Amino acid sequence: MFKGLSKGSQGKGSPKGSPAKGSPKGSPSRHSRAATQELALLISRMQANADQVERDILETQKRLQQDRLNSEQSQALQHQQETGRSLKEAEVLLKDLFLDVDKARRLKHPQAEEIEKDIKQLHERVTQECAEYRALYEKMVLPPDVGPRVDWARVLEQKQKQVCAGQYGPGMAELEQQIAEHNILQKEIDAYGQQLRSLVGPDAATIRSQYRDLLKAASWRGQSLGSLYTHLQGCTRQLSALAEQQRRILQQDWSDLMADPAGVRREYEHFKQHELLSQEQSVNQLEDDGERMVELRHPAVGPIQAHQEALKMEWQNFLNLCICQETQLQHVEDYRRFQEEADSVSQTLAKLNSNLDAKYSPAPGGPPGAPTELLQQLEAEEKRLAVTERATGDLQRRSRDVAPLPQRRNPPQQPLHVDSICDWDSGEVQLLQGERYKLVDNTDPHAWVVQGPGGETKRAPAACFCIPAPDPDAVARASRLASELQALKQKLATVQSRLKASAVESLRPSQQAPSGSDLANPQAQKLLTQMTRLDGDLGQIERQVLAWARAPLSRPTPLEDLEGRIHSHEGTAQRLQSLGTEKETAQKECEAFLSTRPVGPAALQLPVALNSVKNKFSDVQVLCSLYGEKAKAALDLERQIQDADRVIRGFEATLVQEAPIPAEPGALQERVSELQRQRRELLEQQTCVLRLHRALKASEHACAALQNNFQEFCQDLPRQQRQVRALTDRYHAVGDQLDLREKVVQDAALTYQQFKNCKDNLSSWLEHLPRSQVRPSDGPSQIAYKLQAQKRLTQEIQSRERDRATASHLSQALQAALQDYELQADTYRCSLEPTLAVSAPKRPRVAPLQESIQAQEKNLAKAYTEVAAAQQQLLQQLEFARKMLEKKELSEDIRRTHDAKQGSESPAQAGRESEALKAQLEEERKRVARVQHELEAQRSQLLQLRTQRPLERLEEKEVVEFYRDPQLEGSLSRVKAQVEEEGKRRAGLQADLEVAAQKVVQLESKRKTMQPHLLTKEVTQVERDPGLDSQAAQLRIQIQQLRGEDAVISARLEGLKKELLALEKREVDVKEKVVVKEVVKVEKNLEMVKAAQALRLQMEEDAARRKQAEEAVAKLQARIEDLERAISSVEPKVIVKEVKKVEQDPGLLQESSRLRSLLEEERTKNATLARELSDLHSKYSVVEKQRPKVQLQERVHEIFQVDPETEQEITRLKAKLQEMAGKRSGVEKEVEKLLPDLEVLRAQKPTVEYKEVTQEVVRHERSPEVLREIDRLKAQLNELVNSHGRSQEQLIRLQGERDEWRRERAKVETKTVSKEVVRHEKDPVLEKEAERLRQEVREAAQKRRAAEDAVYELQSKRLLLERRKPEEKVVVQEVVVTQKDPKLREEHSRLSGSLDEEVGRRRQLELEVQQLRAGVEEQEGLLSFQEDRSKKLAVERELRQLTLRIQELEKRPPTVQEKIIMEEVVKLEKDPDLEKSTEALRWDLDQEKTQVTELNRECKNLQVQIDVLQKAKSQEKTIYKEVIRVQKDRVLEDERARVWEMLNRERTARQAREEEARRLRERIDRAETLGRTWSREESELQRARDQADQECGRLQQELRALERQKQQQTLQLQEESKLLSQKTESERQKAAQRGQELSRLEAAILREKDQIYEKERTLRDLHAKVSREELSQETQTRETNLSTKISILEPETGKDMSPYEAYKRGIIDRGQYLQLQELECDWEEVTTSGPCGEESVLLDRKSGKQYSIEAALRCRRISKEEYHLYKDGHLPISEFALLVAGETKPSSSLSIGSIISKSPLASPAPQSTSFFSPSFSLGLGDDSFPIAGIYDTTTDNKCSIKTAVAKNMLDPITGQKLLEAQAATGGIVDLLSRERYSVHKAMERGLIENTSTQRLLNAQKAFTGIEDPVTKKRLSVGEAVQKGWMPRESVLPHLQVQHLTGGLIDPKRTGRIPIQQALLSGMISEELAQLLQDESSYEKDLTDPISKERLSYKEAMGRCRKDPLSGLLLLPAALEGYRCYRSASPTVPRSLR
């Protein structure tokens, strides 16, 4: 029907893009899908309704035509009822269409306006048909003096009341209904305007004013409804998203069995860093919108505040849950870390115990040295034991802080206390942070039952609680490990003593050694004792130093701890020095004693002890010195860290505490200057960061020395590295924040200046406008002049509207910029530490400057509007005055003419003239009478015509009343619901059929016309069609297989361990010694062991995954073969027909309809049950009300929060709860009291009162005849009332028309008077507006006073309640006792728990399926990293073919003969585990339904009891009144028994029917689930394909547009370059002429400088001679040394190694090794002080060479700036020594100062941060610098290219080319620092001009690469040329420069790449490679500055000279005026090496 729907595919509401699946929060994509489905159903329903309206219109036209013919032929009208019914149906459908089109506009349908136009056309046609209907069937003969009349005042008043009485909300459904009704009402009001424009009469002005008020009120209500709908929709979406996030946190398992804590932590950190701030901003935006709407007095304040409160509470609960999640994650991580470390300690203790049992039992016949060696090994074991002891002590300390997580899942055996982590308020349950509760029940893992301090029990989320530490199991395990450690220490001591004893026994001589030999050698014994003592003291020192080295520093006070250690270390060093002296003395004594060759056991042990002491002393000495260096470096580093942190924290605090921009004139400029000052201060503090990095390097070197020599890892180094990185990041973040804020404020200042200028101009113009007023003395000429001037002024005011709009636009832009500034400040503040963020002052929501600008904008708009209105009003006054003056002049002319005629005529003529005038007067009277008669005839004819035409709006009024009829409203809603339901079903079925048909046709056509491989991508997307259950089953089988393999591997590992233990228990031999040492050395590094185990496990897992993938391929092959054999005999055409038959199986449709009917019956039964239950509740309440209410004197008021409103609400709820509990207890007590009375009454014989019987029977008896008569009379009364109302309305209408007609006939000539009466006196609209504002002010004052009174009352109530607190607690306990029935509570908790368990199981299954699917995808992704890539590709290709074949076979439906599709589906769904879980779920569901049935049965029992009570009571009455019949007849008792039996039978049958309905419902659910799954997957696939097609088309269009733009820009750039070259050439020629004279002057100056230089050099030589002579007299020497040692990180382990070890292992090649050996040096600065001053010399102690610094300064190898940099410490001595020596290395990339890779840093691909990576030697070449600057041959100096161009030494084009070459090879070169900078950095440092930035940026892309717009990957320029993203002509010069300077550059790799390797890797094409290799064909685009000939870049490099200091290439150039002078100069210029 709609014309809009035929213009595109969007007609059915298909969206232009499909949201991505699996969004992080999930809500936006679901909303989008829901909106899309709703839009599709809406459009289909509208289509159906519009078609029906069209049919009704056509049928009505036919029937009206027939009845019109019958009326003309005077026959009876036949189709009046059918026509009226059709028109009513069309009106109902039109109402629905208006509602639907408004909803479609809100859902942003692209063709909503066209649909609305179509609906309006239908409405006009229906209106026209209604008019024809009334004209034909409702003809009315009116009297001739009565015409049609509409009482507009009453109609408009009714509409005004209807608009004012309109409600808002409170929900979205009601709001949508209200919007639709208002749209209909708005259309009616707009239609009234057309009638009122032509209204004429005395009340026309009043009615129009009333209509304007109505129109304003209607438009205001429409705007209010729209804004309310937008706000409520945003709140609803945000609430749903918050609820989903809360559900995820609450449903998480926080016990020790948590599935993936690391994944949850990553997800939480990602959400906290990237999503939390945006979500908070959206919530704050919604709150701000709500507050703004409330402040603006929005009529829907109630719904807005309700949603605001709900959103605020949900957001607070969500933040509290985030706190809970953080705490629970910390508990889980601490628990797991403790368990892992405990396992490690346990394994270490077991290993040590086994070693003690196996290794340290010496053989009886072993050699004598074996015990000594075992003692040495035992010392190593003792060190390991000491480490384990420290770890055990740490575990014991930490065990007291570990939370008992297993108790969260175990039921408490005894009362257990839990703490609340956060505040929680769910309405029913409130928790406070830090409160302690008692855990009652934790069977539900997600909701615990806890008991509060007051004894009340509540069910709260388990995530909000934590069980306080300690964990008994953790404490017990730590104690157990400590006991095991003590036992092991005792065992170690026993073994050590045994070994010492055996060593002493083995050293005794076996010959005739007398037993008293020891006594014969007392000196030997004394020396041995002294050596033992020295050995013990050295061991103690070693242990002390190792303890210092191993123990980490104190986290709170690292500096104090480190200073204390250094102080202790100094004492230890002094003690070690004294021990060394003592050792030397003892050594001399021992050597002297041993020279005498003594005998005896002590003498034999003495050499061994002496060697041991010497070795240990040397080791301890080295260890002590290394630790001292490490401690000093760490101390320096810690101080630097604190200094840097203090500096950076100061800047951060300044930024955080920055005040908002004030509303002052120069505030923006002041803020810019302040930011610039802070930026300068930050740059000044850069040295602090540099010192920090140098201190870190020194600390790393010291730690590396300690680790290489003693294998002692520094525990504090990783922490210090992290702190340094964090400080560096914070420093850069501060700089970025300052730059960003400065840029924003500068832009805002510029915009503010523009706004200020525009505002000032407009304000000045408005103030100086001419003020012309109308004066009574003004004549016609003055009035005309003023009128013309006023018209010009009005036109000028209208033309100034553009300036006002510009000012408004600038104001909005400026406010947005300031808002952005504040947002950036808030974002940065949130990213800092909480301490800084908390200390920051509270910033206002709107900046003062922003408020000032907003106020200025409002004042300007107000002033402009007032001036425009005043001038327009003055213009109207002038026009009115002009008209009045014209009339006055005309009347005066007539009067003067008449007076002149009368004075000139005679009396006779006056008499004749009077007769003639009388005759003429009579004739005029006759003519007037005739004209009046004709006028009356025409009026009568007009009246007749008016009576024939119906008034359309009158019928519209009736339609509105028809809509408001309550009975018709109810029937209309029911019919509407039925129509909507049927429309939805029809639309869904139609959409499914269309989608299925289209899909079948498309697949058939594609299968016939396309090749199979073209369907690969689509098949891959359809691959997800198999059921999740089958995938889960397969994955579970694979997991079981993996677990089995793990068990086999673990068993094998245990066997290997046993074999290893058996081998270790064997006798110790010589070979075993090496093995033991090796083992001890490896065992020290536990991280390496864990990494090796992880690598082995990963390799085994990879092998298992690959094997599983191959097995999966084999299974798929077997499955394909089976399917092919099964479907080999199937014909495709028959299958296609069978598909259609299966799709439209009538049996299934009948079954579906039958099931739907059964479902409807069950729903009706459920509704009946609900009604019965509600009736029971109502009756129960009636029974309760029969007792007097129990009013307690003390009410419970539990105050949980300080907020008075919350406190009042809680008090009300608790009072209500107490009241209900009291009522229940009272009712129960009353029932117990009444039961014996009831028995007594039943046993008694009632008395008889016949009088009351008669009265009651007559009063309560209702005869059916009487009821029918009453109903008939009521209907008749309603008809009479309706007819009277219609007659009354008709009477009022006719009277109004009569009065109007009389007034029209009574008017003679009052038009002029009525027009002149309308004057601009007081605007009634403004008066009403002022009155309304006054009323609002009064109401606001009343509300404020009421609020103050309410606050005062609440405060008084709060004080009263606080005084009554002690009494409330007692009452609370009593209330708790009288709560609900325990059995019912237990039954309810059990039911809710089982339901939650089932939901949790289902979610757990879904989570497992997702995890397994992710594991499968991860396994498939890991296959790509295997070495055999070709085999993998073949397997994937085969897998795609197999899956394609499977998909085709599965899509091919079976034949008629083979209906096995359902059987196959059943086979696929059958899985043992799944069936078991399904059966368990079904059993649980049956149990729950049984329990529900029991509850229903109990409800029925209660109903029966209540009925018995009521019957008993009623029987008391009845028996009391009719005792004779009831007491004597026993038939009633028999009837009652029979009814009870029937009731039991019906109950049993009903339960059976409910069971059958349950089974049918399950079958229906399964069928509907299956159908929904199929339809959803099909729609998703269709949407995905449509989206892909649209995306492809969009990208193609963008590509074509970009290509066109690129071509246009290329042409523009070429034209600009031509113009620029011409301009620069002309300027260069002019500058050359001007520079000739300047060059001559400079030559003279240079000659004078040369002479001065020669004299200064002569003076320096003389001073040197004098100083050398004086050196012999007095000389002092000061030495400063620095040794440079190069270490290389091993790529796998990260250990340091020397270059020689790296060369031996093959990590670097020989050339690199030689270069690194050359770089190693040991520089020493020797400063000699004499009478002539100081002289410094650099000495290389490695080679013995000396270099003088003064000589280097004289020879200009170094500059004074470099020497000062070295003295200040900014230049390392290694680099300074190279400069002084004048040595240039062939590669700058291997220098000590630049071990940083020169590869581009903008590449998104991952790069290795290690310089010496294994890929370094794969053909990558070194890069050399391009032409870096200009060598001035006239002054013998170097200068930059910018300076050379400025001096006209170099033409601009050549300078531009040289700069582009630098940018293309790594950056612009700074000649002073030899550093390279990017284009932007170079522009900031002044190395280049701003005019050439764009070309340099284009050249820089050759180094950094470009981003592929499609794949978002980083491409080199060669790849970009191949893909067509860049033209080859613009790229070729940059590639040529890269090739000439060392090789091409790939932004994804390090170093330079030769052309051949680049060609092999696909970086460049063959054609481009040939162009690059042909160097002779390079374009000569450079100009030689000296010879002015054209050069290529290669030739220019050949003519360059090398700077001796930096090795940079400098192009020779000279000023033209100096070439002759330099050639004739006798001084030979210094050559450049």
Swiss-Prot record:
List residues of the SH3 domain. 413-470
Where are the annotated coiled coils located?
A: 845-1135
Compositional bias (Low complexity) at which positions?
1-27, 1614-1623
| Compartments it resides in | Cell junction, Desmosome; Cornified envelope; Cytoplasm, Cytoskeleton
Keywords, A to Z, come to:
Cell junction, Coiled coil, Cytoplasm, Cytoskeleton, Keratinization, Phosphoprotein, Repeat, SH3 domain
Q: Mention any one GO cellular component term assigned to this protein in its UniProt record.
A: intermediate filament cytoskeleton
Positions of region (Disordered): 1-37, 65-85, 388-418, 891-916, 1614-1636
What's a Pfam family this protein contains?
A: Spectrin_1st_PEPL
Task: From the UniProt entry, list the residue stretches annotated as the region Globular 1.
Answer: 1-841
- Annotated stretches, region: 4 X 4 AA tandem repeats of K-G-S-P: 12-28
Q: Which named protein is this?
A: Envoplakin
Which species does the entry assign this protein to? Homo sapiens
